[in-house]
Amino acid sequence: MKNRKGIILAGGSATRLYPITCAVSKQMLPVYDKPMIYYPLSALMMAGVREVLIISTPIHIDRFKELLGTGEDLGMKFEYKIQEKPVGLADAFILGEDFIGDDNVALILGDNLVYGSRIEEVLKAASKAETGGLIFGYQVADPRSYGVVEIDEKGNAISIEEKPENPKSDLAVPGIYFYDNRVIEIAKNIKPSERGELEITDVNKAYMNMGELRVIPLGKGYAWFDTGTPDRLSDASDFVKAIELRQGTQIACLEEYAFYNEWIGKEKVEKAIEKYKKTEYGKYLRRMLDRSEKPKYTEIYKSELFQ
């Protein structure tokens, strides 16, 4: 199976969050009890991606290096790249060309949070796609503020539009995308939009026009948050808080995913426990390590009952 690398786009000026983001990166803001970037990073980890490129602005890149380091503590490898100015999501593939090399790639936006009972299984399946492009569709009440995809009965994209006045479907496209290696050349050959950006919608259209853009609808039981406004950021924080306090769990616990993926051993988890010992995050890691294996009930969803 072809290797897949990951890119987290953590740039932009986040003017919709001013004055909060006047001096700090949006992706560093807390979503309840963790930095925002933990959530997209955990999604890549669930997909089985171990090599990740973080793209950010010249003034914020060092903060991400300080927060995340080399990835060694998670059994991963992190690289960093500066995006001098925001010129569109598709620019990530051009900036990341050397990093991607001959591999396939997943791009996730640094302000996106996805959650659901089977989300890990879904992301792993998406990451195994060898060719073409694969995106997700999430039902929303008012799709006019999003990229919108229309699909046929087999899950193939048949139309995709950016913030349409008259949407053809109610499926918004979350900010997580899986592509084969051709995405680099596709990104290089698309033309800037009227706002002067290389649009991810045009990348998706290129795959769709080749008949190679598949869509996985995320139905009931899944949550997706784009935390780009104060209200959405607050909603995401409230959601995470409710889940964690009610269930005694942690969403986007990086060491947990690394441990269960067998990328790190107990000694790395113990190191994190010592670092976070005064927090609920650290206490959760202690409980996880004492349990020492993934809860059996997480496998129930793979049984014939749920197929």
Model regions: which residues?
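Glycine-rich beta-alpha junction loops
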Residues: 60, 112-114, 139-142, 164, ...
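Long, low-complexity C-terminal extensions of enzymes
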Residues: 252-295
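Conserved N-terminal catalytic core of the sugar/cofactor nucleotidyltransferase
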Residues: 1-8, 16-22, 29-30, 34-109, ...
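A short acidic, often aromatic-flanked loop/helix-cap motif at beta-alpha or helix-coil junctions
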Residues: 81, 85-89, 142-143, 166, ...
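Catalytic-core segments of class I nucleotidyltransferases/pyrophosphorylases
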Residues: 106, 127, 156-256, 263, ...
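Hydrophobic packing residues within well-ordered alpha-helices of enzyme cores
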Residues: 17, 64-68, 187, 236, ...
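Basic phosphate/pyrophosphate-binding loop/patch that engages nucleotide-derived ligands
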Residues: 102, 115-156
